[in-house]
From Swiss-Prot:
Protein function: Coral peptide that probably acts as an antimicrobial peptide in the surface mucous layer of planula larvae and likely also in adults. Shows moderate to high activity against some Gram-negative and Gram-positive bacteria (tested on E.coli, B.megaterium, S.aureus, E.aesturaii, B.algicola, Acinetobacter spec.). Does not show antibacterial activity against the coral pathogen V.coralliilyticus.
This protein's name: Antimicrobial peptide AmAMP1
Organism name: Acropora millepora
Positions annotated as propeptide: 26-73
pH relationship of activity: Shows more potent antibacterial activity at pH 6.2 (approximate coral mucus pH) than at pH 8.0 (approximate pH of seawater).
Amino acid sequence: MPSIRVLFVLLAVILLFMEVKMTSAASIVKDVDEDETLENEDGEAMENSWPWHGVEDTSDYSDLSDLANSEKRGTCIDLGSRLYCKLIRRRGMCRSRSHRARIAMMRCERSCGRCHL
């Protein structure tokens, strides 16, 4: 019967690990606070109200060249598993915690402030 106990312990460890991953993802979403004041590259405060009007999921676009040539620029916002752009007139700042998302956000800053996944 010790094998059944080992299986239950293993199952408990797996469930605990899944719980930790879910809470860390939730903390990333909470990081974008409604009342938080963001600053652009010029140090000017940007409005950060939820829901953001003009938020676009650029992962649905097959050709991003017309987006990059647009006069509007966006701020990349990491909401867990995807990056979203908040469209603004001037180039904004990109934020993230995970290494992979930081790389995507650096590409965002280099490409007219658009999110490229």
